[in-house]
Amino acid sequence: MVGATAKDKAGSVENAISQIQKQFGKGSIMRLGEQALEAIPVISTGALSLDIALGVGGLPKGRMTEIYGPESSGKTTLALHVVAEAQKLGGIAAFIDAEHALDTAYAEKLGVNIDNLLVSQPDFGEQALEIAEILIRSGGVDIIVVDSVAALTPKAEIDGNVGDVHVGLQARLMSQAMRKFAGVLNRSNTVLIFINQIRMKIGVMFGSPETTTGGNALKFYCSERLDIRRIGAIKDGQEITGNRTRVKVVKNKVAPPFKIAEFDIIYGEGISKIGDMFDLAVGLDIIDKSGSWYSYKNERIGQGRENSKQFLMDTPAICHEIEEKVRSAYGLPDREETKREETAQIPDTEKTKDV
């Protein structure tokens, strides 16, 4: 429209908006200024340092997250902690066990309510992704974990012989699924977690030879990508009791990326939440360190990290008080306040009915 005035342009835009809303329904297009900006709803990861590194206090709802790393690095442990946190808020969780390796006894130790956990062990990749789509479209499931992308074997590969070549079959399967998930996830407010494995690219001379399975589509569609690694062993005398773990947020669409979180994963117990909170409190000088002694409000709580952690375990009130100070220092909401807000949104009976 050559030479059109600002008034003419505004009128044309209004006509276009009216036509779009008439054809596709109200809400299909809108001005951002007409909608109140709301905080991104999240589910905690169970590790306070990782919630802080993510920038918004956890994994955002209505989006996809990829957790990848080497074998036995804590990928499934982290995902199960997120499931447990979702269930604490009254949410419904589903676990699509493509690897057929879910340890329910271990999941229960991490705080997962296995009686209310929806579990599926699909026979092939297409079935797993279709189950995930049906659960997302139901609108009643708060979190879905797919363990793992590498185990989402296409049906054609399962039906074929061992030596058959299927170039790019899994990548095409994932690409199609990502296109379908992207729209429905946002409307259902479901957190979708994909656990992935690492492979080595052959012939790489420069840069990292590591890559993840399933093609590039998952990397593009995920709002968060978490790289989890073991960086050391935790010992009690000569016995190894756990791993020191580092998580790097390599992609983040809702906050600045490349933040790093470190915490302990104890064998048989999962993430050491008190140890994680203790390290953050020491870093903020909420807990003072003098030599090998730690003090809170000018009173000694223990000599050495382990003794101080034990003191906090034995005194939940002080532990909670310190945690709230840490959360406040990083701008995260009070845990009890978050729980009240989440449980007030949708009644449990209504969610169960939808599923």
UniProtKB/Swiss-Prot annotation:
Function: Can catalyze the hydrolysis of ATP in the presence of single-stranded DNA, the ATP-dependent uptake of single-stranded DNA by duplex DNA, and the ATP-dependent hybridization of homologous single-stranded DNAs. It interacts with LexA causing its activation and leading to its autocatalytic cleavage.
Region Disordered, annotated ranges: 329-355
GO CC annotations, alphabetized: cytosol
Binding site for ATP: G69, P70, E71, S72, S73, G74, K75, T76
Keyword Cytoplasm: yes
Family: Belongs to the RecA family.
Entry's localization field: Cytoplasm
Name of the gene: recA
Keywords for the protein's UniProt record, in alphabetical order: ATP-binding, Cytoplasm, DNA damage, DNA recombination, DNA repair, DNA-binding, Nucleotide-binding, SOS response
Main location: cytoplasm
Cross-referenced InterPro entries: AAA+_ATPase (IPR003593), DNA_recomb/repair_RecA (IPR013765), P-loop_NTPase (IPR027417), RecA-like_C (IPR049261), RecA-like_N (IPR049428), RecA_ATP-bd (IPR020588), RecA_C_sf (IPR023400), RecA_monomer-monomer_interface (IPR020587)
Pfam families registered for this protein in UniProt: RecA (PF00154), RecA_C (PF21096)
GO BP terms in the entry: DNA recombination; DNA repair; SOS response
HAMAP family: RecA (MF_00268)
Single GO term (MF): single-stranded DNA binding
Protein name: Protein RecA
